[in-house]
UniProtKB/Swiss-Prot annotation:
Its cofactor is Mg(2+); Mn(2+). Residues 586-664 form the BRCT domain. Disulfide bonds: none annotated. It catalyses: NAD(+) + (deoxyribonucleotide)n-3'-hydroxyl + 5'-phospho-(deoxyribonucleotide)m = (deoxyribonucleotide)n+m + AMP + beta-nicotinamide D-nucleotide. It is an enzyme of class 6 (ligase). Its EC number is 6.5.1.2. NAD(+) binds at D32, A33, E34, Y35, D36, S81, L82, E113, R136, E173, K289, K313. It comes from Aeromonas salmonicida (strain A449). GO terms for biological process: DNA repair; DNA replication. Belongs to the NAD-dependent DNA ligase family. LigA subfamily. DNA ligase that catalyzes the formation of phosphodiester linkages between 5'-phosphoryl and 3'-hydroxyl groups in double-stranded DNA using NAD as a coenzyme and as the energy source for the reaction. It is essential for DNA replication and repair of damaged DNA. This is DNA ligase. CDD domains: BRCT_DNA_ligase_like, LIGANc.
Amino acid sequence: MSETLSRHRQLCDLLTEYGHQYYVLDNPTVPDAEYDRLMRELIAIESEHPELKTSASPSVRVGGQPLTAFRQVRHEIPMLSLDNVFSSEELQAFEQRMKDRLKREISFTFCCEPKLDGLAVSLLYVDGQLVQAATRGDGATGEEITENVRTIKAIPLSLRGSDWPARLEVRGEVFMPKAGFEAMNAKALAAGEKVFVNPRNAAAGSLRQLDSRITASRPLNFYAYGVGVGGDQLGDSHFGRLCQLKAWGLPMSPEVKLKEGAAGCQAFHDDILARRGELAYEIDGVVYKVDAIPLQEELGFVARAPRWATAHKFPAQEEMTLLENVEFQVGRTGAVTPVAKLKPVFVGGVTISNATLHNADEIERLGVMIGDTVIVRRAGDVIPQIVAVVEAQRPVDAREILFPTQCPVCGSALERLEGEVVTRCSGGLFCEAQRKEAIKHFAARRAMDVDGLGDKIVEQLVDKGLVKTPADLFSLNAIQLAGLERMGQKSALNLVAAIDAARSTTLPRFLFALGIREVGEATALNLANHFLTLDALRAASVEQLLEVADVGDIVAKHVYYFLRQPHNIEVLAAGIHWPAIEKKEASEQPFAGKTFVLTGTLNLLSRNDAKAALQALGAKVAGSVSAKTDVLVAGEAAGSKLAKAQELGITIWTEEQLQAALQS
């Protein structure tokens, strides 16, 4: 029992401290998943030993004490937390507990909502006017943030209509959309200021400003999710209440849906999880609430949460683990990237053992050392990265990360040009790592498209000394290729034929395949369409290169110096050729000067085909939405890009409208 008592005390202390850092200081030091694990362990101990549970236990509290810098506000109706489920089995058990509580067989209709990762707030309207806003605080007492909330454009200062209760308390989440968060951090980074780790911290930090002008400058948004005071004067459906709030001018998430039973909830969860990366805002799960208000009242509450609602958490996108070592990898352009070797940890649905540290500046910014406990984040398809260090757990034998001065692959000197954050190997194609990556890029589907020449084969070709430059690919024969691992005679003959077929290409593909720094597909296309021939491009001065659309000073210099090195285009001697490019008349390029962005799933055309078709008509196809975007093409499950385009008033096309425009 003494061991259990000791662990209970330790868990209470840890959760109290972590809760204070999360709710009060807006500076969480452990991932949500770690906090949830500790809380579940505490609840399990208290279930077996109820005598250990007191009114001061973290299991019956929500958040932490409010900051003394703000006036304290007592909530008339406590703002409780939610219990969690993490699997379909736990979801079914949640539904069964409610049936057992009601002592009858019943079919539940649930109001299902995304679980926004922001800051819960209470808004009090008196006679239709916003008179007070407060944070959740510890659930009983929050902090008054009225002046800051008044700066959030999504929150009405006066309710629309006239049929609202005389006193109405609206509850919801203040959050920062992904696009706004990224733009704000980019601006801060450019100014040498502190950046926020994630949108949740950014939203909370923005609301907790004593100067409301700072809050006003932040891209905050708000979605209502419930009613406190005054709710008894509204309808008997939770979803209906949200719709009523929307009619009065309070926004609700467009993803809110009514679903039947645990099976319907699970389907909602799976759908939102699949589209998580496309949503305009961060979420860490979904919330299920019994829709019928009379049933909510009958089910009641436990100490810290309602019995009629639960949060279904997604696989954690952030986890704690140990940084065991750092290796330095060399890329196609010589960029040296520090890669963290981690104690394997399950994050975002996969096991992670590596994470990028980006560059020397990022290592310095994080203050990370080998041996540290770190927080690693994996969101969607983004490469896992370390976002924070748990300095309190740093061991005495932690080691500084020393950036090498020589290439770890070829031994050439490393250099970092003034104004750049990237350190590069100066070895060029002498460096085996650069050689391999350059050849992989050259043969890629979007470049020379050598069918069957995968990464493993390229690595063998370089390791055996058969290929030193892309030009060497065209002198390979079937006998040489048949000597490679897992390469039979037939496969070797097929690969020789594929290499031979790749000699016929287009000038834009060839320019992209060369691997000139900063020259992507769009820039390669612009260069080809401007100069029409490789000879004209090679003869161009830096000033002439600057006349090409979207080519700035840095790109112009990269192109100029690259094409003046004979070995960079010796591949031409292998007989690579392309059809002549004809100067297009203005009538043939109706989208000239227009910038398009593609988002969501396209069904009529592949993304690459749509991009190529638009570029052929003179359009620029960008990867992100900005004020310079002319048209957004929105396919199925369009998310944050669509939301930003709507916010900026940009023209939005369906895929059918795009198809019609391409055929006209």
